Amino acid sequence: MNNKEIFNNKETFNNEEIFLKKQILTYMGNKRKYLKKIDEIIVLVKNALDQETLTIGEGFSGSGIVSRLFKNRASDKNNNLGTFYVNDISGYSKTLNSCYLTSSKNLSTGDIENLILHFKKIREFIKTPQNPEPFIAKYWAPKSDKDIQPNERVYFTAENAKIIDQMLYYIHNIVEDKYKCFLLAPLIVQCSIHNNTNGQFSAYYKDENKEKGMYGGKKQVDLNRITGKITPEMPLLTSHKANVHVSQNDVLKWLNTIPEVDLMYYDPPYNKHPYNIYYFLLDIINNYDTNIKIPDTYRGQPKNWEKSNYCSLKKAKSEFKTLINKTKAKFILVSYNNKGIIPIKELDEILLEKGNLYKIPFENGAFNKYLGIAAKKRKKKNEKLEEFLWLVDCRP
C-alpha cells in the first residue's frame, strides 16, 4: 500500500481501534489499559452534565495515549465541536500531541500531497551516501555494531543512529514548519521502541561483566525489537475533530492559561525517578539541538533539567494538593497507584476536600518494575501493584 492509499484507506487511517493501539510511545505507566474505563467515565460525565460535547483538560499527557481518546470524545456525533486543552512539560509529548491530535479532516488535499512527497523524499534521503554531521550516532551509539568499545554509549545500533541523524537533518532543514511534527512524531515513537534498553533511557544493556554495551545484554533479550530498523512511517490519524490546544508548560502555570473545564485528568509522576531521566533521549531527538553540550557521563544527559516536585518525598503531597485546589473543573479524574510517593489514604483526603469522591480500583496482577527509591525506603519491593482511578464531582 502506497502513501496516498494509507491516507485514504479507512482501515488504516481513520480507524479508531488502530489509532488507540498503534504508533504508541513505549512509556513507563502507559495508560493504554485504562482507556476502556476512562471512556466509560467520559460517558458518565456527559450524562451527569446532560451534554454531548465537553471541554476537557489533561495536565500530564506523557505518551499521549489518553489524549487521543479525549480528542475523539470531546465532540459529539453531529460534529458539534468540544474543546481539549492538553499539556505536558516534555517537548516530545508536545510533538506527539501536535501530530496525533490533528484531525485528518483538517488536512487539505494539498497538505496530504505535500506530506506524501516528504515521506517519499525522506526515504530516498536516508539511502544517500551523503550524511549530515553525526549527532545521535556520535554520542549515543557505537561506531561499529561488531566492535563495540567500552567507552561507547550503546542506546541505538550504529545503523539506526545514522538513520535518526539523517531523518532529523531532513525534518529540521527541509520540511516546512507546519509539517515537521507529522514526520518527527512517528520517528520519536520508533526511537522509543528500537533501542537497547528495557523501555526507558536511564541505562542501556551491557555485557555480562558490565564493561561495555551489548545489544540485549548477557541474556540477549528483545534483539528483534532492539535491532529492528527504523524507517519513516506515516502518522496514524482519525477524522474526529475538536478544538485542540496543545501546550508545553509546568502544570500549575498551564492552569493559569485555561478556563474552567468540564473534566480534568491528571496522571502525575508517581515515584522519585524523574521522567526527564527516563526519557531524556526522546527530548534530545525532539529538540535536535546539535550545539548543546553533551557531558562525559554514563548517559550523556545534558545538565539542563529540573526535578519535578511530584518526584520529591518532601514536596509531592503539597504540590498535588496545590494542583487540586487550583483546578477549575466540574469533574476531576486522577490516576495513581499504591507504590507512589503520596500514600493512597492521604490522596483520598486531598480529593475528598474538593468534592464528592468516587474511587475506582483497577485490577492489575503485575508487579511494579519501577519501584524507585521511595518504594525501596518503604520496603514495598515485589508487593502487588494496586492502581486506582478517582473521579471527583466538584459541582456545588
Describe the residue ranges of each PLM region.
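Glycine-rich S-adenosyl-L-methionine
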Residues: 284-323
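Class I S-adenosyl-L-methionine
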Residues: 344-348, 354-396
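Conserved proline-anchored active-site loop of SAM-dependent methyltransferases
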Residues: 56-70, 86-91, 251, 257-278, ...
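S-adenosyl-L-methionine
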Residues: 1-9, 13-59, 65-69
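SAM cofactor-binding core of SAM-dependent methyltransferases
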Residues: 54-125, 133-141, 149-153, 161, ...
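Conserved Class I SAM-dependent methyltransferase catalytic core
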Residues: 307-354
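A polyampholytic, Gly/Pro-enriched intrinsically disordered region
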Residues: 105-117, 267, 376-391
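SAM-dependent nucleic-acid methyltransferase catalytic core
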Residues: 9, 15, 34-40, 141-278, ...
